[in-house]
Curated annotation (Swiss-Prot):
Major location category of this protein: membrane
Record-linked InterPro entries: Membr_insert_effic_factor_YidD
Annotated source species: Geobacillus kaustophilus (strain HTA426)
Subcellular localization: Cell membrane
Annotated family: Belongs to the UPF0161 family.
SMART domains per UniProt: Haemolytic
Record's function text: Could be involved in insertion of integral membrane proteins into the membrane.
Origin superkingdom: Bacteria
Protein's recorded name: Putative membrane protein insertion efficiency factor
Keyword list, A-Z: Cell membrane, Membrane
Length: 81
């Protein structure tokens, strides 16, 4: 399922996104965020994070740098004790 979601995002990036002006207020773009979130967390949690990110994309949100959160195992591995 995750690969199917990534395929849908890639389809959007390649064929639909070029038809409209660049409007993403975030870095990375919402579509790149979605791909990274799905790869890192899987289809369900990654899809949920992507949906939350897209819902933040409106004129009243300042935007800016909004990276995909680290997975808990990655955070534990890099934690300094």
């Amino acid at each position: 399922m995750g690969q199917w979601l990534i395929w849908c995002i890639r389809f959007y990036q390649r064929f639909l996104s070029p038809l409209k002006p660049p409007t993403c207020r975030f870095y990375p773009t919402c579509s790149n965020y979605g791909i990274e979130a799905i790869r890192r967390f899987g289809a369900i949690k990654g899809g949920w994070l992507t949906a939350k990110r897209i819902l933040k994309c409106h004129p009243f949100h300042p935007g800016g740098f909004d990276p995909v959160p680290e997975s808990s195992e990655h955070a534990k591995r890099n934690k300094i004790t």
